[in-house]
């Protein structure tokens, strides 16, 4: 297989036949069956003076096998120059043939595969997904209402927000991105109401809480607000600008900035692809610049932006557990032994990409495991004691290249963890994953799509629940008493803990809340995740005034 260096026109391959021959027919077998490849073929006797034989530089016809009659007398060398493809595939082919006579017949399986080539969209896009044992699965949303799903976030109360980018990773046309809001009003596991919540280019990461939707759409982090709760954003505020490079306009959103997750510590964590950024400006005017990839974090209001760690390639999400351990599926997929890594991310650590980790491993923070080829996408840590073991406390990572969602149950080992991975869900080209407050999981798929817009019938979203778990409606936290919020803050689900915390913080500081949080943090009978949530809530609620109580808590032998 030969592949162009990138999607830009001009990459070429030179073929030497060994001796000059009179060539009458040539044939290319391209990698993709649904690509309209654009190319030129030239011939030469001496590799200096070239004659144009085939010009398909403006081709729009979808064909995987492209035969051509040529008049190439006394030709030893051929040059195939790629000008890209529609959709935005890189030029790549399996085979180039040159014959002095007629073209030989191709093997039947090659002909059969190439006959799938067509300029028309597929008539069906039947979701290809294999649910894990012990789980119920429904197709929650699919075209035409929901297609090209890049990212998603589940509201605690069950609404699902899906980031749609018809331009994919390499398309550059503006006006093709949006976030849709999906509702299942009758509880059958399928969305029956879908509307556009907000429009923007290249949505890559979403967080929703209480009418507010944070959207990472490179080069911006924007807060969209639905103040009248009609399901459509009516206000927006730019929190961070320049959190990418100008390659968004030149190359598309690939390798720019990606998923976002909110931790119980009061920060939004941004997965930064390896193009980095050179003029990221927060809401408070703070400016950062750094090439490469890793994690940046920022407060929900766009202030205090800072680099958390660095030296990763194209991570698409940060998976945060209740104790603020962070894991990533590192898309270090350059080939030649540069593969998918699973990492425990530690603040200030350097993970070595691209300069160190292959040849100077002793100078970097090592990954927990290397899993070979793949294409890591969205991920999350999910803690919920209502789910059966081992599914209720683990890292879930999507791998687009391997068409699977993996479950990781990393076991503590000193200051870090031992790696673990098993296949959780077989699903075609998964892109993102999230869970709502009732314990319903959602996974999006890019099935049927390429690297930019090709046709409308692309992608779907599924919903999963354990068979022994009956989802209970998650309450409107704004209508709960403080006592009820404390129960959710220390409750079984990481999602519940976070959204209870956010409501407590909205209500503001008073003496009763401070005392209640100190009591929760001190109670050894409360699950550890709940006590940790109480400590982080206390600090965010009381600010510097929390120091005295935090010092007293640190004296307790069961608080470390």
Language model features by range: what are they?
Residues 472-475, 494-509, 529-543, 548-555, ...:
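Structural detector for internal amphipathic alpha-helices that build alpha-solenoid repeat scaffolds
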Residues 479-487, 509-522, 542-554:
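Amphipathic alpha-helical scaffolding segments comprising HEAT/armadillo-like alpha-solenoid repeats
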Residues 22, 46, 55-58, 85, ...:
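Disulfide-stabilized cysteine-rich extracellular repeat microdomains
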Residues 30, 61-62, 106-487, 495-506:
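Beta-propeller domains with acidic blade repeats across secreted/periplasmic ectodomains
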Residues 1-112:
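Aromatic, loop-rich ligand-recognition surfaces of beta-strand-rich domains
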Residues 15-17, 26, 41, 80, ...:
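Residue-level detector of buried hydrophobic side-chain packing
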Residues 9, 13, 22, 46-49, ...:
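Cysteine-rich, disulfide-stabilized extracellular repeat modules
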């Amino acid at each position: 297989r030969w592949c162009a260096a990138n999607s830009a026109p001009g990459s070429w391959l030179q073929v030497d036949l060994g001796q000059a021959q009179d060539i009458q027919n040539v044939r290319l077998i391209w990698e993709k069956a649904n690509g309209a490849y654009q190319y030129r073929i030239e011939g030469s006797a001496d590799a200096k003076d070239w004659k144009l034989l085939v010009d398909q530089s403006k081709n729009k016809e979808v064909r995987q096998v492209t035969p051509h009659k040529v008049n190439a007398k006394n030709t030893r060398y051929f040059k195939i120059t790629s000008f890209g493809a529609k959709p935005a595939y890189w030029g790549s082919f399996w085979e180039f043939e040159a014959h002095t006579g007629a073209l030989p017949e191709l093997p039947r399986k090659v002909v059969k595969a190439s006959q799938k080539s067509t300029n028309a969209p597929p008539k069906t896009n039947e979701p290809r997904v294999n649910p894990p044992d012990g789980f119920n699965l429904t197709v929650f949303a699919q075209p035409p209402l929901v297609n090209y799903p890049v990212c998603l976030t589940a509201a605690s109360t069950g609404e699902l927000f899906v980031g749609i980018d018809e331009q994919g990773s390499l398309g550059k046309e503006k006006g093709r991105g949006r976030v849709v809001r999906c509702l299942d009003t009758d509880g059958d596991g399928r969305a029956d109401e879908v509307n556009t919540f907000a429009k923007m280019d290249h949505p890559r990461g979403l967080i929703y809480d209480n009418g507010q939707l944070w959207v990472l759409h490179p080069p911006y982090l924007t807060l969209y607000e639905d103040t009248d709760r009609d399901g459509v954003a009516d206000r927006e505020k730019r929190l961070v600008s320049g959190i990418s490079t100008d390659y968004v306009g030149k190359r598309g959103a690939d390798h720019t900035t990606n998923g976002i997750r909110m931790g119980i510590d009061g920060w939004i964590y941004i997965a930064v692809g390896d193009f980095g950024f050179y003029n990221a400006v927060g809401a408070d005017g703070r400016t950062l610049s750094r090439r490469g990839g890793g994690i940046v974090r920022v407060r929900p209001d766009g202030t205090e932006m800072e680099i958390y760690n660095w030296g990763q390639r194209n991570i698409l999400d940060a998976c945060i557990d209740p104790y603020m351990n962070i894991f990533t599926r590192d898309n270090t997929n350059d080939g030649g032994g540069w593969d998918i890594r699973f990492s425990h991310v530690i603040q200030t650590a350097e993970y070595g990409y691209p300069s160190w980790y292959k040849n100077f491993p002793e100078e970097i923070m090592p990954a927990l495991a290397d899993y070979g080829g793949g294409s890591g996408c969205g991920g999350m840590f999910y803690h919920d004691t209502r789910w059966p073991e081992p599914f209720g406390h683990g890292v879930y990572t999507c791998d687009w290249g391997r068409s699977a969602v993996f479950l990781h149950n990393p076991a503590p080992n000193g200051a870090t963890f031992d790696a673990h991975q098993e296949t959780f869900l077989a699903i075609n080209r998964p892109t993102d994953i999230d869970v709502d407050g009732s314990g319903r999981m959602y996974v999006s798929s890019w099935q049927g799509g390429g690297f930019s817009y090709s046709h409308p019938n692309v992608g779907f979203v599924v919903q999963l629940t354990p068979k022994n778990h009956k989802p209970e409606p998650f309450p409107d936290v704004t209508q709960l008493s403080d006592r009820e919020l404390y129960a959710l803050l220390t409750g079984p689900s990481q999602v519940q803990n976070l959204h209870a915390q956010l409501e407590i913080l909205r209500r503001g500081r008073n003496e009763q809340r401070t005392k209640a949080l100190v009591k929760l943090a001190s109670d050894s009978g409360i699950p550890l995740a709940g006590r940790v949530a109480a400590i982080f809530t206390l600090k965010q609620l009381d600010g510097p005034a929390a120091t005295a109580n935090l010092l007293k808590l640190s004296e307790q032998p069961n608080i470390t």
